[in-house]
Amino acid sequence: GIPEETPTIAINRQCSSGLEAINIAAQLIKTGEADIAVAGGTENMSQVPYLIDYKARFDGLRMGDSTLRDGLTEGLGCPVNRYHMGVTAENVAERFGVSREEQDELAYISHQRSSTAISEGRFTNQITTVDVPQRRSDPIQVHTDEGPRSDTTLEGLSGLRPVFKKDGTVTAGNASSINDGAAMVVMMS
């Protein structure tokens, strides 16, 4: 294992923290500050907690109410414009002229390619089986990426309604999905 004395850093944000960790590890190796680095990240979007006002940590909640905020909505919101990242996807599609059909086609191709790679066992040596405890039954073994849907069709995608703007182009089928997962790499000079 990795000795306890090994220096570490943690990046705590909703998305791309794993990629940032890999970039930092690469910089450490490139500058000679490290010969070997372990980098990675996790996403646990299905278990994001509800949040209370930050001041409650230090001041408590004395004789008053506090509003619970959905941590997932907070994480998927733009802190500058205060709207969901799905609206950002709509804005980007509009700005760069990406049609609904193009988005659906990319989603379809992505699902098909991923499903084919899974069925051919291309990820078998990259995914570690995880046992997920159940309340009243044996643990479920997760050993495959659950995001790709092999039954995705262009017809099915085209029938989905926009979810972020009334006349928008981003749907539950062509938007980024909400996932749980983790990845780790060992990097060396």
Residues of each region from the PLM?
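A short, structure-level motif marking secondary-structure boundaries and short turns
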Residues: 10-11, 73-75, 99
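Flexible glycine-/small-residue-enriched beta->alpha junction loops
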Residues: 36-92
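Active-site-proximal alpha-helical scaffold in enzymes
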Residues: 13-43, 93-122, 184-189
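Proline- and acidic/polar-enriched loop/turn elements at helix boundaries
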Residues: 9, 41, 49, 105, ...
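Conserved catalytic cysteine-centered active-site region
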Residues: 1-37, 79-84, 151-177
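Flexible glycine/proline-enriched surface loops and loop-helix/loop-strand junctions
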Residues: 72-74, 94, 167-172
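N-terminal extracellular/periplasmic Venus flytrap/periplasmic-binding protein-like
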Residues: 102-189
